Amino acid sequence: MALIIRTPIQPRFADFDSFGHANNIAQQSYFDVGKAELFQELWRLTGALKRIPAMIVSVQNDFFAQIRMEDSVEVVTRIDSIGEKSLTIAQSIMCGDRECSRSRTVMVCYDSETQQSVPVPDEWREYV
């Protein structure tokens, strides 16, 4: 079962520059809110929160269209792929049916006690 999280975003006044569009840093924070909701749901479904933390090792963002103050903003988040010890999160910022930006984040599962990467929990794999 693919897990797709849709997160409505309430843009803040400070997100907008003098041209009236959301800056790139604000958009990264929108992506972060979507990732947080994805992991909260994943941990709720699997109980793997305390056992397996994941850390970001790579982020790539592409920007296609402006986000304006009057836009209704939603982040769509899903797990795109899972490797042995890493997973790739795919996200889009949508304003209605218009994709404004896209992000791909690679995360590695990591054991902070041993300071080693560890396998992705098997129970996460069913949500790709």
Language-model segments: what does each one mean?
Residues 1-74, 80-128:
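Terminal targeting signals and extreme-terminal segments of soluble enzymes
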